[in-house]
């Protein structure tokens, strides 16, 4: 699947907010200091949560914590927790237990004496990186956002070796692919978006186009672990449906577990990427009627949509499109391509977890707007700000 924007050609803007690592800089990490999450833990109120006022104070703090997680602690307009969470009293009856807790559930958990750190971990677990693309440029050509670069991943018996089959027909190890990426000046890394589980609505997202652009990040991996996790996420989102077998998923899980054991406490971005891999792998298995490794890590809207999609009914198809594929609200006031805009091309393989790419030209339009707004190209390693 290839989608090209309708904008006019132009020169490629420079990416001033990120800098590609060079060989020998594998030890470089994201900025040191306290993350928004840790800062919120330290700032947690010490009120008596058994009282009504104490519970409300703690609930307000939890709301700020969730906002800090979803917006990186920045000063941008915050998304209310009510908008982030889809959970309600009927969530468990709908099999939607993976939704982010509401602010009232936060208060209840705190009133029951739930440790602050445990509560924060519960929030963070629902923050997921999605929609991975490799970014490639060439003089006088559209910027290519390729999600289908890797057509297959073969995993060694112990999960330590990953052999990649590229769309070009070439085979190489993950380490060789990482080395090649470091040497290619036209490979600008990856782009991904940060969502919560409830915001991923199968064929659409529960965000306006302006909010989605604010959630996009460039990552130019500076370690082989980060690079491997980006490739693995991208592959899970674009895997050929006939390749989704139990044995293949077991081997991918072994590779993921091997990578997770290399993640240190301070490697916050790597932990985010690994968490995304877990959600994607378990959701993919559930959508293909395979036993998921952890049913709590199935994206909630997919869990509800799966049985509906299996029923063949013309009336039901219209309902599913209305529930999961509509962008009517999210595209309000989206500008048309400018004459000086750089053209972009989106390349992806039709797969279970990337239905949003097939939904008209919505995602390619968002990518074009994001790429042609250089100040929006935020460095993923800067998500964790320094608190003084």
From Swiss-Prot:
Coiled coil: none annotated. Residues 1-55 are annotated as: Disordered. Residues 23-32 have a biased composition (Basic and acidic residues). The keyword Transcription does not apply. It comes from the Viruses. Keywords: Host cytoplasm, Host Golgi apparatus, Virion, Virion tegument. The keyword Protein transport does not apply. InterPro entries: Herpes_UL7. One of its GO terms (cellular component) is host cell Golgi apparatus. Pfam families: Herpes_UL7 (PF01677). Residues 1-18 have a biased composition (Polar residues). It is found in: Virion; Virion tegument; Host cytoplasm; Host Golgi apparatus. Belongs to the herpesviridae cytoplasmic envelopment protein 1 family. Plays a critical role in cytoplasmic virus egress. Participates in the final step of tegumentation and envelope acquisition within the host cytoplasm. This is Cytoplasmic envelopment protein 1.
